[in-house]
Design a protein with these regions (language model features):
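Short, glycine/charged-enriched secondary-structure capping and boundary segments
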Residues: 57-58, 80-82, 102-103, 123-126, ...
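A charged N-terminal "starter" segment
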Residues: 1-127, 166, 170, 204, ...
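Structural preference for beta-strand elements that scaffold enzyme active sites
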Residues: 41-43, 64, 83-87, 108, ...
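General structural feature for long, well-ordered alpha-helical segments within catalytic domains
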Residues: 22-25, 29, 50-54, 72, ...
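Short glycine-rich, flexible loops that bind phosphorylated cofactors or substrates
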Residues: 118, 138, 361
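Active-site loop/helix belt of alpha/beta enzymes
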Residues: 135-275, 370-372
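Charged (often Lys/Glu-rich) extended helix/loop segments that serve as interaction or gating elements
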Residues: 5, 236, 247-394
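Active-site beta-loop-alpha junctions enriched in small/polar residues
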Residues: 24, 45-51, 68-72, 91-93, ...
Length: 394
């Protein structure tokens, strides 16, 4: 949570919806992560928040970058990073994007299928490659599992990495992902064991890998849902690495996104309407000017439960309310099965803060669904530029 944002918003009303970011909190999170994960190289997952000021900050901290597209690579390079600090980490890349990345100097690519490996060979010759595997625990403990769409099994990983050299590529490492917002530190144990088996099998074939990629998934705190400290994750991960690799550990990299930027943002929204469906209905619906199509996509299935506060009505009595977005799509309902406590006195025009929204919000925002503008983003020091006078009733 960032008090700087709440303090900055206390005396002004800004144009909504708007995501306000605190770079000081991001810098603090990054330094803490590096300290707790000592000897592990940090590749920021750009997809979490690719705002230019976020990227330039992390460049100044000497971070590495995990990019999901050539467009993200372009943003990172524009922020001042060197192509040698970039991994093209998506396993789904057009041949033209691989070629474009290679042209600007990127030499590290991830894959999980034979055809993808061939594309890298054709368009990025001589590059280092990392094969992503499926974890055996199927994303248990994650709020947002990622295990079905990506990765291959252990046997295929061995076969593909065995072919990489013959294709003119450098077989470098194996990666996995335990799922986003992973609240179980032990989730990394089994995949690290899987990696050790693959390393041994390839070593027997004369192929020495040099990198372990333990992926992302490191969580941030949402509301009252406490998560383990990063140090707890570090202890479990390093213990597993010691068990399975001993003193012969290769380079280890991690790809945090949410853990670095999640708690560094607050979406400022406005109540559009408070309604009931009949005169006898006690259930309120609260419609905000931000919803599933404006950055809150991770409320899908109510997986991520953001904390909502109403600064002007902190002392008001509350009752549960269904929370929905502003569009003409019924899917744009955020919390219906588990309504949120909202002030009884809440009315249209009230400001609602959606906390811990620094990750996976603005990048999810639609370009113009229902004609509504994408979610605006500003830095906390620039909120004065986003303000507007309160409307006066006629």
């Amino acid at each position: 949570m960032t008090l700087r944002i709440e303090t900055a918003l206390a005396d002004i009303k800004i144009a909504t919806p708007c995501l306000v970011l605190d770079r000081e909190q991001i810098a603090k999170n990054y330094k803490n992560f590096c300290h707790k994960m000592k000897d592990i190289d940090i590749f920021y997952a750009v997809k979490a928040n690719p705002h230019p000021d976020v990227l330039s900050l992390l460049v100044s901290e000497n971070a590495y970058f995990d990019c999901a597209s050539f467009q993200e690579i372009t943003l990172v390079l524009a922020a001042g990073s060197h192509p040698s600090n970039i991994c093209f980490g998506s396993t789904l890349k057009k041949a033209s994007d691989i070629a474009d990345a290679y042209k600007v100097g990127v030499r590290y690519f991830t894959f999980d299928a034979k055809e993808e490996l061939q594309k890298i060979s054709d368009h990025a010759p001589g590059s280092s490659v990392c094969c992503r595997i499926i974890t055996n625990d199927f994303g248990t403990g994650a709020q947002w599992p990622l295990n079905r769409k990506f990765g291959c099994d252990e046997d295929m990983a061995v076969d593909l990495m065995s072919e990489a050299g013959d294709l003119g590529l450098i077989p470098s490492g194996i990666s996995f992902h335990v799922g986003s917002q992973q609240t179980e530190p032990t989730a990394w144990q089994a995949p690290i064991a899987q990696l050790s088996r693959i390393f041994r099998q390839l070593a027997e074939l004369g192929i020495a890998l040099d990198t372990i990629n333990i992926g992302g998934g490191f969580p941030t705190t949402f509301g009252d849902d406490a998560v383990p400290d990063i140090f707890t994750y570090a202890k479990v991960i390093k213990a597993a690495l010691n068990v399975h690799f001993g003193d012969k550990k290769p380079r280890v990299i991690a790809e945090p996104g949410r853990a670095l930027v999640g708690d560094a943002g607050i979406i400022v929204s406005e109540v559009v309407l408070v309604a009931q469906k009949s005169s006898n209905d006690s259930q309120r619906w609260v419609y905000l000017d931000v919803g599933r199509f404006h950055g809150l996509a991770e409320t899908e299935g109510e997986a991520i439960r953001y904390r909502l506060t109403v600064p002007e009505r902190q002392d008001s009595a509350t009752t549960p309310a269904i929370i929905a977005g502003p569009t003409c799509d019924s899917v744009d309902t955020l919390y219906e099965h588990n309504p949120v406590e909202m002030p009884v006195a809440l009315k249209s025009g009230d400001i609602v803060l959606v906390h811990d929204t620094g990750a996976y919000t603005a990048t999810y925002s639609s370009v113009g669904f229902n004609g509504l503008s994408p979610l605006r983003v500003c830095l906390v020091e620039d909120v004065n530029q986003m303000k507007f006078p309160k409307l006066q009733a006629i």
